[in-house]
């Protein structure tokens, strides 16, 4: 359907019998109305043409060949005085054969039939609205008990005589002769309410607003009663309150959607378009048909038998009519949900027939496999691996995927820059992987975001936008911080990449879907880009050194194993000297020493710090103070060193750290400075 804003959408719900008939009804030039499927046949065994008024009828569902009717005529062969839209002989409309993918038919049921989804679903919507036990409603629908009090408000024989228990037996004896009389149909329509027709009458008599008011009053009474102390009674009261809330919500939903409750009982059964339930002829005279066709045949046969019995109701026994109604109900239940009545229907090879529910639901159903998970152009798929050098908004695309996605853009730029003269030569350059191709590809990718999606897409963070970069290999590289939004990890998970083509899609990707703009959970507002797993282990290894400060040198010096014998009588062991640990004036010098392998990642070192950033605690006492001949001194603390002159002025400060701490600090500092610049730019 298309709403007022021209957004294409799909809505599943209840429809009226008039709407079902409008989907399928056609009026021929001679005034004949077609659309009802009355025969269970499909194709004629001799001519291989669809049977008239059957499940594949061309009058109902449209022609098999575009513009050619069942007679073999085309629109050009129609006489001038005839309607050009229909064939006067066979009544087939001259339209495109693709109409058989969406043109529907219907089956006019001889008796009302309850929809199994609304009767046996959990919770049962019919039982909730009627406020009756599900077992009793099922017994009424499937004829387990033959008659009930009528739903009409006029006085009847059963209503007057069935109110007293001592008269029930005499009532039954007086009614039983009517089941074999010729006037059973009249008696049944007035005195007996059974089957789905009784459910439909009760649903039609409901006033949804009164249901909401009465349920609200009862809920308030139960709320005012409070707890009685009896666990069993309190439990029943809680269950009743939950039921009343659910009933009010259901009635409110029916009112808001303009849906009538009696539509849950079917009088017309829609028939799917033929292309959605095809019959395929294979080599060797083998025919492969959809299971839904067999289930439709079963419904039509039983419905025709019931219609025949109702026409001859004066001769047909009442028990036979009621039994046939039950068979029609079971056939429709099997069509909608084959497992609703216990054992599903099987074919001659003991294979279970697939019902409409089986075709729709599940991972291999119509929605998840065909509509939601179908293959689309300008998309790819690969395994994800960690990309530690990527920014939060970047992803690494393999060369093979990138050149396929951006092939048309690369061809356009090759021709625009006069690197090639036509498309054929451009494709050959791409096939031969010439250097100019990769240069243009990187230029194209620089201004074009891509979308990454991991199934199942349970919330909006399941698909996010990234700036692509070229990487070697055949895997997609991803920043580890964005994995939580996708619920992904690097143990073989796959992700799909899509290319937004239109300017509107690219603008939406940049403004709303970029990963660095989705840092909070849309459900609860908590940060969703937090370090986990590998990142936490990496940060731990990076900052594992320098925990005890300079005291570690006095009690467990760096490089001493537990089994190594230490000479504690040596006075130089406790004495601090500058030669033991290197001093660096900046972090760049420390990184250069690490690249030259003069220090390790967790080796302790002294780094000169800024004087304007005080790190000395007011109550902290130096561990050791060293004086030099020129009056300078060194105050040694647990994690820092203060160098002063003879005037007691601080000349420099050194902190005791490791290269891992320096690298971690630099990353945080750059991230904060980048955020500050971006924030000031937006202001």
Swiss-Prot record:
Q: Which InterPro entries match?
A: DNA-dir_RpoC_beta_prime (IPR045867), RNA_pol_asu (IPR000722), RNA_pol_N (IPR006592), RNA_pol_Rpb1_1 (IPR007080), RNA_pol_Rpb1_3_sf (IPR042102), RNA_pol_Rpb1_clamp_domain (IPR044893), RNApol_RpoC1 (IPR034678)
E.C. designation(s): 2.7.7.6
Q: Name one Pfam family in it.
A: RNA_pol_Rpb1_2
Q: Which GO terms describe its cellular component?
A: chloroplast; DNA-directed RNA polymerase complex; mitochondrion
Top enzyme class: transferase
Which cofactor is recorded for it?
Mg(2+); Zn(2+)
Q: Which GO terms describe its biological process?
A: DNA-templated transcription
> Any idea where this protein resides?
Plastid, Chloroplast
Q: Where is Mg(2+) annotated to bind?
A: 489, 491, 493
List UniProt keywords, sorted A-Z.
Answer: Chloroplast, DNA-directed RNA polymerase, Magnesium, Metal-binding, Nucleotidyltransferase, Plastid, Transcription, Transferase, Zinc
Citing just one GO molecular function, the answer is: DNA-directed RNA polymerase activity
> What superkingdom does the record give?
Eukaryota
Q: How is the cofactor bound?
A: Binds 1 Mg(2+) ion per subunit. Binds 1 Zn(2+) ion per subunit.
| Residues annotated for Zn(2+) binding in this entry | 69, 71, 87, 90
Say yes or no: keyword Nucleotidyltransferase present: yes
Reactions this protein catalyses = RNA(n) + a ribonucleoside 5'-triphosphate = RNA(n+1) + diphosphate
Q: Does the keyword Lyase apply?
A: no
Family listed: Belongs to the RNA polymerase beta' chain family. RpoC1 subfamily.
Describe its function. DNA-dependent RNA polymerase catalyzes the transcription of DNA into RNA using the four ribonucleoside triphosphates as substrates.
- Subunit details: In plastids the minimal PEP RNA polymerase catalytic core is composed of four subunits: alpha, beta, beta', and beta''. When a (nuclear-encoded) sigma factor is associated with the core the holoenzyme is formed, which can initiate transcription.
Protein name, entry field: DNA-directed RNA polymerase subunit beta'
Native organism taxonomy = Eukaryota, Viridiplantae, Streptophyta, Embryophyta, Tracheophyta
């Amino acid at each position: 359907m298309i709403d007022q804003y021209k957004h294409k959408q799909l809505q599943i719900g209840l429809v009226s019998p008039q709407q079902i008939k409008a989907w399928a009804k056609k009026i021929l030039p001679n005034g004949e109305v077609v659309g009802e499927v009355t025969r269970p046949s499909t194709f004629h065994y001799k001519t291989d043409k669809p049977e008239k008024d059957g499940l594949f009828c061309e009058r109902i569902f449209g022609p098999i060949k575009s513009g050619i009717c069942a007679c073999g005529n085309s629109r050009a062969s129609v006489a001038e005085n005839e309607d050009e839209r229909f064939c006067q002989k066979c009544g087939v409309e001259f339209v495109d054969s693709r109409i058989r993918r969406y043109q529907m038919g219907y089956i006019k049921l001889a008796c009302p039939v309850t929809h199994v989804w609304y009767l046996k679903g959990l919770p049962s919507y019919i039982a909730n609205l009627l406020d009756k036990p599900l077992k009793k409603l099922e017994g009424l629908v499937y004829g387990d008990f033959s008659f009930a009090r009528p739903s009409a408000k006029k006085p009847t024989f059963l209503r007057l005589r069935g109110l007293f228990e001592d008269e029930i037996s005499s009532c039954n004896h007086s009614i039983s002769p009517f089941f074999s009389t010729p006037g059973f149909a009249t008696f049944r329509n007035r005195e007996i309410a059974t089957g789905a027709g009784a459910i439909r009458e009760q649903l039609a008599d409901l006033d949804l607003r009164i249901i909401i008011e009465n349920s609200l009053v009862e809920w308030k009474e139960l709320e005012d009663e409070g707890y009685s102390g009896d666990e069993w009674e309190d439990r029943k009261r809680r269950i009743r309150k939950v039921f009343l809330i659910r009933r009010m919500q259901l009635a409110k939903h029916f009112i808001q959607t303009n849906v009538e409750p009696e539509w849950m009982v079917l009088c017309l059964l829609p028939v799917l378009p033929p292309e959605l339930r095809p019959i395929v002829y294979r080599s060797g005279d083998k025919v492969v048909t959809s299971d839904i066709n067999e289930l439709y045949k079963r419904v039509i046969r039983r419905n025709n038998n019931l219609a025949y019995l109702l026409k001859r109701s004066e001769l047909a026994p009442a028990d036979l009519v009621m039994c046939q109604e039950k068979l029609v109900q079971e056939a429709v239940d099997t069509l909608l949900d084959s497992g609703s009545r216990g054992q599903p229907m099987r074919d001659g090879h003991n294979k279970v027939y697939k019902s409409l529910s089986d075709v729709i639901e599940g991972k291999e159903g119509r929605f998840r496999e065909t509509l939601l998970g179908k293959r689309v152009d300008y998309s790819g798929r690969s395994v994800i691996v960690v990309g530690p050098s990527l920014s939060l908004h970047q992803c690494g695309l393999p060369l093979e995927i990138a050149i396929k996605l951006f092939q048309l853009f690369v061809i356009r730029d090759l021709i625009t820059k006069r690197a090639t003269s036509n498309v054929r030569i451009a494709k050959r350059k791409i096939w031969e992987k010439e250097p100019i191709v990769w240069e243009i590809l990187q230029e194209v990718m620089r201004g074009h975001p891509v979308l990454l999606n991991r199934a199942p897409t349970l919330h909006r963070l399941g698909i996010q936008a990234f700036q692509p970069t070229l990487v070697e290999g055949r895997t997609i590289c991803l920043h580890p911080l964005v994995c939580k939004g996708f619920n992904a990890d690097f143990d073989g998970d796959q992700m799909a990449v899509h290319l937004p083509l239109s300017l509107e899609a690219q603008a939406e990707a940049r403004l709303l879907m970029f990963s660095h703009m989705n840092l909070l959970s849309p459900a609860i507002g908590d940060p969703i880009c937090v370090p986990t797993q590998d990142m936490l282990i990496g940060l731990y290894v990076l900052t594992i050194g320098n925990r005890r400060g300079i005291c570690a040198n006095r009690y467990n010096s760096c490089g001493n194993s537990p089994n190594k014998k230490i000479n504690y009588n040596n006075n130089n062991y406790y004495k601090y000297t500058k030669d033991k640990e290197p001093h660096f004036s900046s972090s760049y010098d420390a990184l250069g020493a690490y690249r030259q392998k003069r220090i390790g990642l967790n080796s302790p070192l002294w780094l000169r710090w800024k004087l304007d950033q005080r790190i000395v605690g007011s109550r902290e006492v130096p561990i050791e103070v060293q004086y030099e001949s020129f009056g300078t001194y060194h105050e040694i603390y647990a994690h820092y060193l203060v160098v002063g002159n003879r005037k007691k002025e601080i000349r420099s400060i050194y902190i005791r750290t490791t290269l891992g701490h320096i690298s971690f600090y630099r990353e945080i500092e750059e991230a904060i400075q980048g955020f500050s610049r971006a924030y000031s730019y937006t202001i």
